[in-house]
Swiss-Prot record:
Family from the record: Belongs to the phosphoenolpyruvate carboxykinase (ATP) family.
Name used for this protein in its record: Phosphoenolpyruvate carboxykinase (ATP)
SUPFAM superfamilies named among the record's database cross-references: PEP carboxykinase N-terminal domain, PEP carboxykinase-like
Gene3D superfamilies attached to this UniProt entry: 3.90.228.20, Phosphoenolpyruvate Carboxykinase, domain 1, Phosphoenolpyruvate Carboxykinase, domain 2
Coiled coil: none
E.C. numbers: 4.1.1.49
Gene giving rise to this polypeptide: pckA
Organism in which the protein naturally occurs: Shewanella sp. (strain W3-18-1)
Assembly and binders: Monomer.
Length: 513
C-alpha cells in the first residue's frame, strides 16, 4: 500500500522493493537474482558514532564508556526532529516488524527507511509476523536516513553520522550511514538490554538443531565461523547470529541471516550459496561484466555480506526456536597458533572464556580496521553490542548451563603450527568434523590430556580429525617457540581478566601465566 500524498510505501513486498531499488539507482541485479548495493566509505559498523541516550530509566543499568557512549536527551530530541523534517518530503518505505521469535519476549518495531534496499534488508533480517504485535506491546521506532548529514557542532555527534538508541522513548535513529548492518545490531543491542531483566540470556551466537531435537549454540565474533558452521546440511538452522536463551528453550532474535561473502564457495558453504537468490541483498559484492558475483574480490571491503530471509534456507526450524542446548561451542580464532582445535570446558572455564572472549578480528566488520588480522578480547564474544555490565550476562550463562547441564567446548578456527603468517589455518572440513563429534555426543566423557600452560582438557582422539592436530605442540616444528607463544598468550589472558570481579574458582579456571 502506498500513501500517494507523501509517497510512503507501507509493508511493501520483496518484488516491489527490488523494483524501487533498481528504478531509484540504489543497486543492480546480479546473474543469480540478488540485489547488489554499495555502502560507500562506511562498509562496516561505526562504533565511534554509536550512542545511548543517558536518561533516568536506564542510566544506572548501562556500562558507560567507549562502547556505550552517552548522548544528552535534549540533543537527541533536536536531532530526531531535524531528521523527521528532512524526511518529510521524501519517498519513504515503512514496515511493521518484530524482533524476537518468542511469543513472550518479542519487541514490535516500525522501521522507516529512506532507501528501498534498506527496507528490503530490514524485512529480510527482522521477523515479518502473521499478526503484528499480538500482545499489544509499546512499539519501537527505527528511522534510517542515510543521506542526512549530521553536524557535530549542532547535533552533538562525533562525525557526520550517528547511531543513537533511546530506551525511554523506544527509538533508534540512524543518520548518515548506508551500511545496513547498523540496523540489525541496533535492535540486537536493544534486546541485549531488555532481555536480562526478563531472566533471558541474549547471545551473539548461531544455533541449529538435529533430527532428534538436540540444539547446539555457536558463539563467536564475525568471521570465526558462526554462520558457516551452523549452516550444516545435516541439521536444521534456527539462526546465524542473535539468540535468546530462556528457561525451557532458545529463540532467534531475527528472521534472517547476514552472512559474510568473502571467498564464499559452493563446495564449502552450500547452504549459504543456495540462499543467495532473488530477494537477497548483497552488500559491497563486486560483479564481473556478466553480473556474476566475484566473492573473492575484496576491493571494496573484506566485509562483503549477503542478507537473506530464513525462508531461503531449505533445512531450517520453521518456528525459529529450539530446546535448551546440549552443546555450547565458543568459537575462537587464535592468531598465535597456540590453542588446540577443541577443548572441553568446565562450568568455571566456560564463565572465564565467555568473559574473556578471546579471538581475532577477521575481515573486521568495523570501519577503519585494516585487513591485518589482530587478536582481541571481546567480552561475551560481542562486546560492542552489550549495554549492561559483562557480569550480568556471565551470571545468566552460568545459571542456564547449570540448570540444564549443557556441555561447553572451546573450538579454535584459527591457526596451528605457528602464528598467522607462519602456521596454517584449520580448514573448514577439519572444524566440521570436530563439530560433528560435539553434536553427536562423542566428546562427552572421553579420554583427555591436560595442557598445563593453557589449563585446557583436550581429547586424545576425534573421529575424522588427524590426532596430531589435537595437541598443538605437535604441529610446531620448534617446540621451544611454541612454549614461548603459549606463555605469551597465557599472560595476555591473565592481564585482560584482571578487570573482572569474579570468584576464585572462575579466576583460576584460565591459563596459567
Amino acid at each position: 500500500m502506498a500513501d500517494g500524498l507523501h509517497r510512503v510505501h507501507y509493508n511493501p513486498s520483496t518484488a516491489q522493493l527490488v523494483e524501487f531499488a533498481l528504478l531509484r539507482g540504489e543497486g543492480e541485479l546480479t546473474a543469480n537474482g540478488a540485489l547488489v548495493a554499495k555502502t560507500g566509505a562506511r562498509s562496516g559498523r561505526s562504533p565511534g558514532d554509536r550512542f545511548i541516550v543517558k536518561e533516568p530509566s536506564s542510566e544506572a543499568d548501562i556500562e558507560w564508556g567507549p562502547v556505550n557512549q552517552a548522548f544528552e536527551p535534549g540533543a537527541f530530541e533536536g536531532l530526531w526532529a531535524r531528521v523527521e523534517a528532512y524526511l518529510a518530503d521524501k519517498e519513504l518505505f515503512v514496515s511493521d516488524l518484530e524482533v524476537g521469535a518468542d511469543t513472550e519476549h518479542y519487541q514490535p518495531v516500525r522501521v522507516t527507511t529512506q532507501y528501498a534496499w534498506h527496507q528490503l534488508f530490514a524485512r529480510n533480517l527482522f521477523i515479518i509476523p502473521e499478526e503484528f504485535n499480538r500482545k499489544d506491546k509499546p512499539v519501537w521506532q527505527i528511522i534510517n536516513a542515510p543521506d542526512f548529514v549530521c553536524d557535530p557542532a549542532r547535533d552533538g555527534t562525533n562525525s557526520d553520522a550517528a547511531v543513537i538508541l533511546n530506551f525511554a522513548e523506544r527509538k533508534v535513529l540512524l543518520a548518515g550511514l548506508k551500511y545496513a548492518g547498523e540496523m540489525k545490531k541496533s535492535m540486537f543491542s536493544v534486546q541485549n538490554f531488555l532481555l536480562p531483566a526478563q531472566g533471558v540470556l541474549p547471545m551473539h551466537c548461531s544455533a541449529n538443531v538435529g533430527k532428534d531435537g538436540d540444539t547446539t549454540l555457536f558463539f563467536g565474533l564475525s568471521g570465526t565461523g558462526k554462520t558457516t558452521l551452523s549452516a550444516d546440511p545435516k541439521r536444521f538452522l534456527i539462526g546465524d547470529d542473535e539468540h535468546g536463551w530462556a528457561p525451557g528453550g532458545v529463540f532467534n532474535i531475527e528472521g534472517g541471516c547476514y552472512a559474510k561473502c568473502i571467498d564464499l564457495s559452493q563446495k564449502n558453504e552450500p547452504v549459504i550459496w543456495d540462499a543467495i537468490r532473488f530477494g537477497t541483498v548483497l552488500e559491497n559484492v563486486v560483479m564481473d561484466e556478466h553480473r556474476v558475483p566475484n566473492y573473492k574480490d575484496s576491493s571494496l571491503t573484506e566485509n562483503t555480506r549477503a542478507a537473506y530471509p530464513l525462508e531461503h534456507i531449505a533445512q531450517r526450524k520453521e518456528d525459529n526456536c529450539g530446546a535448551e542446548p546440549h552443546a555450547v561451542v565458543f568459537l575462537t580464532c587464535d592468531v598465535s597458533g597456540v590453542l588446540p582445535p577443541v577443548s572441553i570446558l568446565t562450568k568455571e572455564q566456560a564463565a572465564y572464556h565467555f568473559l574473556s572472549g578471546y579471538t581475532a578480528k577477521v575481515g573486521s566488520t568495523e570501519i577503519g580496521s585494516t585487513s591485518a588480522i589482530q587478536s582481541t578480547f571481546s567480552t561475551c564474544f560481542g562486546a560492542p553490542f552489550f549495554p549492561r555490565p559483562a557480569g550480568v550476562y556471565a551470571e545468566l550463562l552460568m545459571k542456564r548451563i547449570e540448570s540444564f547441564g549443557s556441555q561447553v567446548y572451546l573450538v579454535n578456527t584459527g591457526w596451528t603450527g605457528g602464528p598467522h603468517g607462519l602456521g596454517k589455518r584449520f580448514d573448514i572440513p577439519t572444524t566440521r568434523a570436530i563439530v560433528d563429534a560435539i553434536v553427536s555426543g562423542e566428546l562427552k566423557d572421553v579420554e583427555t590430556i591436560h595442557l598445563d600452560t593453557l589449563n585446557l582438557a583436550v581429547p586424545v582422539a576425534v573421529t575424522g580429525v588427524d590426532s596430531n592436530l589435537l595437541n598443538p605442540i605437535n604441529t610446531w616444528g620448534d617446540k621451544a617457540l611454541y612454549a614461548e607463544y603459549a606463555q605469551k598468550l597465557a599472560e595476555a589472558f591473565t592481564k585482560n581478566f584482571a578487570k573482572y570481579q569474579v570468584s576464585d574458582a572462575i579466576r583460576h579456571a584460565g591459563p596459567k601465566a
